[in-house]
C-alpha cells in the first residue's frame, strides 16, 4: 500500500504488483509443499465448507476450536457428508498446516497390504518388497496429521497394532526389529456405529476410547435443507441458483431424502448442467431419475425423532399439538385439521394450508 494526501484526505493505493507477487508466492509455497510432502497435502479449508445451516455452523465452530489443539478427533456421519473435507480444514487451521496431511482409507486398502501400507516394511520383508524398504503412512505423516478414514473397516489384528502405535507414538516396520518415534495428530472417521461393532465383537473398545477423545458428528444433507441451494451454487460455480428452478423442482429437491448426501447432490448438479435448457427454469423433467422417481412414488420426507422435534419447537408446543391430535375412545380425531391450523396461525407460526 502507498499513502497519498489529497486536500487533507489521506487515501491508500494498492500496488497490484505487490498483490500479484504475494499470490505468486502463495502458489509457489503450495507447489513446494506438495513436492516436499510427496502430494500429502490438505486441499480444503473451513472457508470451503458451506455453513448456511445451524447444524453445520455448530460443528465447524467446535472444529475450529479443536484445530488449535493436538487432541485426537473422531468424525462420524453418513457416507458422503464431507468427513475428509472437515479433517483437511482442521489440519489447515492448525499449527501443523505446513506439514503433511496423509489419508489412509481402511475400506480401500486390501487386508494383506494394510499393515505394510500403514507401518512400512524393510527390504526382504516379503516377496516383492522394494529394495531399501518403504516408509509407511504414519512415517510420512511425521510432524503432520494422519487421517484414518473408514476406521470401522479395520480388522481386529490391524486394530491391535494401531492401538499400540497411537499409545506409544512409535512404529515398527514389517520385517524390522527397531522402532521409529513419530509425532502425528490423529483424525479418524467412520460412517459406522462403532459402539454397535464393539457389541458385536468387531471393534476393540480400547481403540474406540483412544480415538474418541473428541467426536464431531456431521449431519446428513436431509437435515441441512437451508444449505442445499447454497451448495448447488458452490458446486456449479455460481451458474445454478435457487432462482434457476421451478417451485415444483424446489419442492422435490427439498423433500428428497438424499441418501448419497453431498456426493449425490454434486452428481445432480453435473446432471443438470448437461440436461438444462438455458431458456427456461429447471423443472422435474431435468432432474435425475432417482430423485423424480422418489417424488412420483409419493416419497415421504425424512421424519425426525420426537427429541429433534422438541429441540426445535419446544416441549410445551409439541405437547399441546399432541393433545390436539389425541384420539378419543371411538378412534375419532378430537380436533379437525382446520382447528390445528387456526391454533398455529393464532400464535403466528408458519403452517401449510
Where are these regions (language model features)?
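Catalytic acidic motif of RecA-like/P-loop NTPases
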Residues: 20, 152-153, 163
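Conserved RecA-like P-loop NTPase ATPase core
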Residues: 59, 81, 104, 118, ...
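Conserved post-Walker A coupling segment in P-loop NTPases
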Residues: 62-128, 139-155, 220-225
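Nucleotide-binding/hydrolysis machinery
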Residues: 52-55, 96-99, 175-185, 193-298
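Dynamic helix-loop-helix/coil hinge segments at AAA+ ATPase domain boundaries and subdomain interfaces
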Residues: 19-20, 34-60, 112, 256
Amino acid at each position: 500500500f502507498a499513502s497519498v494526501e489529497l486536500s487533507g484526505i489521506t487515501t491508500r493505493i494498492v500496488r497490484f504488483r505487490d498483490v500479484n507477487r504475494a499470490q505468486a508466492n502463495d502458489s509457489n509455497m503450495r507447489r513446494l509443499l506438495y513436492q516436499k510432502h510427496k502430494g500429502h497435502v490438505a486441499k480444503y479449508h473451513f472457508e470451503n465448507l458451506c455453513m448456511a445451516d445451524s447444524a453445520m455452523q455448530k460443528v465447524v465452530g467446535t472444529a475450529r476450536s479443536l484445530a488449535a489443539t493436538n487432541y485426537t478427533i473422531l468424525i462420524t456421519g453418513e457416507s458422503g457428508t464431507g468427513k475428509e473435507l472437515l479433517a483437511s480444514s482442521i489440519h489447515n487451521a492448525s499449527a501443523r498446516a505446513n506439514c503433511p496431511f496423509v489419508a489412509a482409507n481402511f475400506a480401500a486398502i486390501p487386508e494383506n497390504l494394510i499393515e505394510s501400507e500403514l507401518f512400512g516394511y524393510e527390504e526382504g520383508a516379503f516377496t516383492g518388497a522394494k529394495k531399501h524398504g518403504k516408509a509407511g503412512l504414519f512415517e510420512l505423516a511425521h510432524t503432520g496429521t494422519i487421517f484414518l478414514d473408514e476406521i470401522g473397516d479395520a480388522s481386529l489384528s490391524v486394530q491391535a497394532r494401531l492401538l499400540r502405535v497411537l499409545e506409544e507414538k512409535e512404529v515398527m516396520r514389517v520385517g524390522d526389529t527397531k522402532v521409529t518415534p513419530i509425532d502425528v495428530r490423529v483424525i479418524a472417521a467412520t460412517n459406522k456405529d462403532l459402539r454397535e461393532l464393539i457389541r458385536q465383537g468387531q471393534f476393540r473398545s480400547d481403540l474406540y476410547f483412544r480415538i474418541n477423545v473428541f467426536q464431531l458428528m456431521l449431519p446428513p444433507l436431509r437435515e441441512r435443507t437451508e444449505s442445499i441451494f447454497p451448495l448447488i451454487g458452490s458446486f456449479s460455480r455460481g451458474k445454478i441458483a435457487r432462482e434457476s428452478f421451478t417451485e415444483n423442482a424446489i419442492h422435490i429437491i427439498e423433500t428428497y431424502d438424499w441418501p448419497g448426501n453431498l456426493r449425490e447432490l454434486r452428481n445432480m448438479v453435473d446432471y443438470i448442467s448437461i440436461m438444462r435448457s438455458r431458456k427456461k427454469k429447471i423443472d422435474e423433467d431435468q432432474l435425475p431419475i432417482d430423485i423424480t422417481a422418489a417424488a412420483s412414488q409419493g416419497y415421504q420426507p425424512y421424519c425426525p425423532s420426537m427429541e429433534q422435534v422438541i429441540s426445535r419447537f419446544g416441549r410445551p408446543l409439541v405437547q399441546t399439538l399432541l393433545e390436539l391430535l389425541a384420539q378419543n375412545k371411538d378412534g375419532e380425531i378430537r380436533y379437525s385439521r382446520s382447528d390445528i391450523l387456526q391454533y398455529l396461525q393464532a400464535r403466528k407460526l408458519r403452517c401449510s394450508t
